Swiss-Prot record:
Positions of region (Disordered): 33-57
This protein's name: Ubiquitin conjugation factor E4 A
Family matches, as CDD domains: RING-Ubox_UBE4A
Listed PROSITE patterns: U_BOX (PS51698)
SMART domains membership: Ubox
Coiled-coil boundaries: none
Keyword RNA-binding part of the UniProt annotation: no
Catalytic activity field: S-ubiquitinyl-[E2 ubiquitin-conjugating enzyme]-L-cysteine + [acceptor protein]-L-lysine = [E2 ubiquitin-conjugating enzyme]-L-cysteine + N(6)-ubiquitinyl-[acceptor protein]-L-lysine
Purpose: Ubiquitin-protein ligase that probably functions as an E3 ligase in conjunction with specific E1 and E2 ligases. May also function as an E4 ligase mediating the assembly of polyubiquitin chains on substrates ubiquitinated by another E3 ubiquitin ligase. Mediates 'Lys-48'-linked polyubiquitination of substrates.
Organism: Bos taurus (Bovine)
Length: 1067
């Protein structure tokens, strides 16, 4: 029988309608033939049916209706078998059937499949796939080195189908198995119920084969299995279908964990982490691919078993070497930022190159773009850490141990030498980027309890920081993973051992880890920013000077400036991502609340209201490291300098900061370190409104801060705290205290000025002055009296130093202009230039500070008079004012006429105006005017006449000039009268003269230890600065001195006698 006849017979068979195509029916017939043949081989031939056997009829291709009807005893089984074959072909895109595509219907079979030729030969006449041979078929398919060479058409369609070719001929076996998994999933949703178990079995087969591939990758030639896994995940993430891949991998991971005979699960997965580490380290912050890799790690850190492998994998080879943490996979991730990878090297740096060629708007756009990526990046790292903390106690312990050990190994970042030796620094410690990013992620972890009224916040236990060394098991039980905090200096010294709880909560650990990370990272970067700022200013000045003098160094200076500007913009951008700043502000405000609660002895879970006087019970501050308060101050100062808008938009929370400053600035009992308390004054300057921040400030830019500052309920205590720390930093015990105190006091002057302009603060300052006036001779000099004494000391020293430096600058400028430097050797000229620059910096600093001190005295004397005109202070302030006028308006003023006053912040007009204002404020007091002529060193009627001339020249208001002229006349009259009296008393004996001032004593007192007699006003002034006997250095207070009544009476009798004699002479 011919093929045509055979086909006709089958097509006319009514059962053929059960098949999808004529080819399917023919295939069924072949199956039956095979089965019957096997049966005939096993059973003896029967003479009754041998002539009519189906086998025989099939051999002869005699497909009559009767014969096929007898063969198809189980129609359902036959259809099922064919459908299983088609399903396997659709899932795995493989086949054993290479018959003519035109004989196949194309209905339910894929257009292209890989023909498994060797397997087809082995199975001889079986050209279909079933559940018995599918596992072998898939394994055979996986071993093909180039499956694309084995593709065949399954349908008669001649249309080019590249996607079908690509899918069936997929060379990467991991991707192939995932695709099979997806196709099996689809089959499960479509096949009839009777085929569902087989579809599920095929799906499981993809998982089991993937497990085998990962366990024994070496048997698959030219297949980098782990690379394929990573690529598959990346492609799925970028393509937006990662959930499907995750479902597949979940099952593969589960299968791997159940089968660790060949390889353990970590051994299988570590190569994946190796690949991720090598790829991530070369990526930049703004590359989309980076975020795909981070999403892969996010998936892994959600998987309990993968997360365990991850936390083991990131352990550094040497846990004591801080830099080694940066080389781990987590460290590689944390090291990515817009900061320079190698400090000072801008080559290959992708951000802010040639900034001078970019407009401010372009720089702003680039900054905003980087911030968008940073926010996304920090979120990924945060989610990763959060996953590890929440997944299991084991991963939580491991990641916290990693963080604690890392911070301990990098503790040296804060050492002074670390900034001075960068080449050693970067070999020993992890990078700035590492800690900035880690800090940003940890800040996010703290946000749930970073609310000022959070009850969770008060569960923080500071004794955590006092724990000594623990072993690993103890750390796990107690939840303590930071090391070495017991060696940190705390806010106050501990007087007793703390009571340690059984364990600590995550709030405590998170706060400590975050604060220490900020201390190692943000704090150090802020210092660098300030130095970069200073260097930029210096370069700008040098560049401008070089341009003006047509120096060949100009181009080099410009290049240096350009490079440093790139560093500055990159660093500023890295530190000012808005969400990170807001999170940090939330933390620091919460820390202010927490420290205030500890300072008032609150050990409960509910907030206590702040009341004055402060209650006792603040011993827990002895376990709070200073860096908690240092971070708070440092961050707020940073915001003031580089992100002031954050302060304004968060003004409502600043009241908590004011509480903190009020309590700690003035309380040595709660914060022993005077340097840290002085820093809080700078913090106060940072958070208070600055009306002069721009030439035309918008009221709204400080409106909210002004409201908070002016309505602060503890204004009087804040003003007192500020004045107290002003006084305290005079005696810090530091060998550099003299130089330091001026820097510490710099921010205090604008604060005092702002306070004086606000009613509540001004009244509280006046109350302090009134109290001082009434207690001038108290055992301990009143606070405000000591403050005024130090203020005048500063004014005298600073302006005198400024005058000296300006005189030197004047001389050097003249020498330079005359050409005297032209003949010097290059080295000598450089020394001269450096000297001039140094004098300029010193003059500028002293001028700024003297302007502030004199200005402060000017507004204070407007309403506080009694203290200034008291003999304790009057002579000192008068001699100071006259001395300065002598240099500013007298014949000596020519020595101060440097080229450019503004370059050195020299403001002689303002100084003259302020000095005259002080005179006019106090001039109504008769004893003050009477004291002016007693200044024999500087006062003269001519000096005041010269002052009037200068006031006219600088266009001061007419009423001021008239008032000062009248005052000058009054003082001149008193001077004439005093001169006559002095002539009368010129021959006073030494017993009547003050041994220190050599002036006639008016109120002699005896010092208890040295038994020396001095004038009361003289010793009172001395004790304001030094509470010792000036003659033997014994401790001395005003309440210990005794009046020398006998000597006082002798002096008064002698004065009366002299006056009487003078009167008689005149008559």
């Amino acid at each position: 029988m011919t093929d045509q006849e055979n086909n006709n017979n089958i097509s006319s068979n009514p059962f053929a309608a059960l098949f999808g195509s004529l080819a399917d029916a023919k295939q069924f017939a072949a199956i039956q033939k095979e089965q019957l043949k096997q049966q005939s081989d096993e059973l003896p031939a029967s003479p009754d049916d041998s002539d009519n056997s189906v086998s025989e009829s099939l051999d002869e291709f005699d497909y009559s209706v009767a014969e096929i009807s007898r063969s198809f005893r189980s129609q359902q089984e036959i259809c099922e078998q064919l459908n299983i074959n088609h399903m396997i072909q659709r899932i795995f895109l493989i086949t054993l059937d290479n018959s003519d595509p035109s004989l196949k219907s194309g209905n339910g079979i894929p257009s292209r499949c890989v023909y498994l030729e060797e397997m087809a030969v082995d199975l001889e006449d079986q050209d279909w796939l079933d559940m018995n041979n599918v596992e072998q078929a898939v394994f055979t398919r996986l071993l093909l080195q180039d499956p694309g060479n084995h593709l065949i058409n399954m349908t008669s369609s001649t249309t080019l189908n590249l996607s079908a070719d690509r899918d069936a001929g997929e060379k990467h076996i991991f991707c192939y198995l995932y695709s099979c998994f997806q196709r099996a999933k689809e089959e499960i949703t479509k096949v009839p119920e009777n085929l569902l178990p087989f579809a599920v079995q095929c799906r499981n087969l993809t998982v089991s084969n993937t497990r085998t591939v990962l366990l024994t990758p070496e048997i698959y030639v030219d297949q980098n299995i782990h690379e394929q896994l990573v690529d598959l995940m990346v492609e799925a993430i970028l393509g937006g279908h990662f959930e499907s891949v995750a479902e597949f991998l979940d099952e593969v991971i589960e299968a791997l964990i159940l089968d660790e005979e060949v390889r353990t699960f970590p051994e299988v997965m570590i190569p994946v982490f190796d690949i991720l580490s090598s790829r991530i380290k070369d990526l930049e912050l703004c590359q989309i691919l980076l975020y795909a890799y981070l999403d892969i790690l996010l998936y892994f850190t959600k998987q309990k078993d993968m997360a365990k492998v991850f936390v083991d994998y990131i352990q550094p080879k040497d846990p004591s070497n801080g830099q080694m943490y940066q080389k781990t996979l987590l460290g590689v991730i944390l090291n990515i930022s817009c900061l320079l990878k190698t400090p000072g090297v801008i080559e290959n740096h992708g951000y802010f190159l040639n900034p001078s060629r970019s407009s401010p708007q372009e720089i702003k756009v680039q900054e905003a773009n980087i911030h968008q990526f940073m926010a996304r990046y920090h979120e990924k790292i945060y989610q990763m850490l959060k996953n590890l903390l929440q997944l299991s106690p084991e991963t939580k312990h491991c990641i916290l141990s990693w963080l604690g050990n890392c911070l301990h190994a990098n503790a040296g970042r804060t050492k002074i030498w670390a900034n001075q030796m960068p080449e050693i620094f970067f070999q020993m410690y992890a990078s700035d980027a590492f800690f900035l990013n880690l800090g940003a992620a940890l800040l996010k972890l703290c946000q749930p309890f970073c609310k000022p009224r959070s009850s969770r916040l008060l569960t923080f236990n500071p004794t955590y920081c006092a724990l000594k060394e623990l072993n690993d098991e103890e750390r796990k039980i107690k939840n303590v993973h930071m090391r070495g905090l017991d060696k940190e200096t705390c806010l106050i010294p501990a007087v007793q051992e703390p009571k340690f709880p059984q364990n600590y909560n995550l709030v405590t650990e998170n706060l400590v880890l975050t604060e220490y990370t900020l201390y190692l990272g943000f704090h150090r970067l802020h210092d660098q920013m300030v130095k970069i700022n200073q260097n930029l200013h210096r370069l700008q000045v040098a560049w401008r000077d070089a341009q003006q003098s047509s120096s060949p160094a100009a181009d080099n200076l410009r290049e240096q400036f350009e490079r440093l500007m790139t560093v500055y913009l990159s660093t500023k951008t890295a530190m000012t991502e808005p969400q990170m700043l807001q999170n940090c502000l939330n933390l620091q405000v919460s820390m202010a609340v927490l420290l205030v609660q500890l300072a008032i002895g609150n050990e409960g879970s509910q907030l206590m209201e702040l009341t004055f006087p402060l209650p006792d019970g603040y011993s827990s501050l002895a376990y709070v490291p200073e860096f908690f308060a240092d971070n708070l101050g440092d961050f707020l100062i940073f915001l003031r300098r580089f992100a002031d808008d954050i302060l304004e938009t968060s003004a409502d929370s600043l009241e908590h900061v004011l509480h903190f400053i009020t309590i700690f600035t003035g309380s040595i009992e709660r914060m022993k370190n005077p340097h840290l308390r002085a820093k809080l004054a700078e913090v106060l300057e940072a958070v208070m409104p600055h009306m002069d921040q721009t030439p035309n400030p918008l009221v709204s830019s400080v409106f909210h801060r002004k409201r908070v500052f002016c309505n602060f309920p503890y204004a009087s205590h804040l003003a007192e705290a500020l004045i107290k720390v002003f006084v305290d930093i005079e005696f810090t015990g530091d060998p550099h205290q003299f130089e330091q105190k001026f820097n510490y006091r710099r921010p205090m002057y604008p604060i005092l000025k702002y306070m004086w302009g606000t009613d509540t603060y001004r009244e509280s300052i006046k109350d302090l002055a009134d109290y001082a006036s009434k207690n001038l001779e108290a055992m301990n000099p009143p606070l405000f009296l000591r403050f005024l004494n130090l203020l005048m000391n500063d004014a005298i020293f600073l302006l005198d130093e400024a005058i000296q430096y300006l005189s030197k600058i004047k001389i050097q400028q003249i020498e330079k202009d005359r050409g005297e430097w032209d003949n010097l050797t290059p080295e000598a000229r450089r020394e001269k230039e450096a000297g001039l620059q140094m004098f300029g910096q010193l003059a500028r600093f002293h001028n700024i500070m003297s302007n502030e001190t004199i200005g402060t005295l000017a507004f204070l004397t407007s309403e506080i008079k009694s203290l200034f005109v008291h003999p304790f202070l009057a002579e000192r302030i008068i001699s100071m004012l006259n001395y300065f006028l002598q240099h500013l308006v007298g014949p000596k003023m020519g020595a101060l006429k440097v080229k450019d006053f503004s370059e050195f912040d020299f403001k002689p007009q303002q100084l003259v105006s302020d000095i005259c204002t002080i005179y006019l404020n106090l001039g109504d007091e008769e004893n003050f005017c009477a004291t002016v002529p007693k200044d024999g060193r500087s006062y003269s009627p001519t000096l005041f006449a010269q002052t009037v001339r200068v006031l006219k020249k600088i266009n001061k208001p007419g009423n001021m000039i008239v008032a000062f002229s009248n005052l000058a006349e009054r003082i001149k009259s008193l001077a004439d009268l005093q001169q006559q009296e002095e002539e009368t008393y010129a021959d006073a004996c030494d017993e009547f003269l003050d041994p220190i001032m050599s002036t006639l004593m008016s109120d002699p007192v005896v010092l208890p230890s040295s038994r020396v007699t001095v004038d009361r006003s003289t010793i009172a002034r001395h004790l304001l600065s030094d509470q010792t006997d000036p003659f033997n250095r014994s401790p001395l207070t005003m309440d210990q001195i005794r009046p020398n009544t006998e000597l006082k009476e002798k002096i008064q009798r002698w004065l009366a006698e002299r006056k009487q004699q003078q009167k008689e002479q005149l008559e």
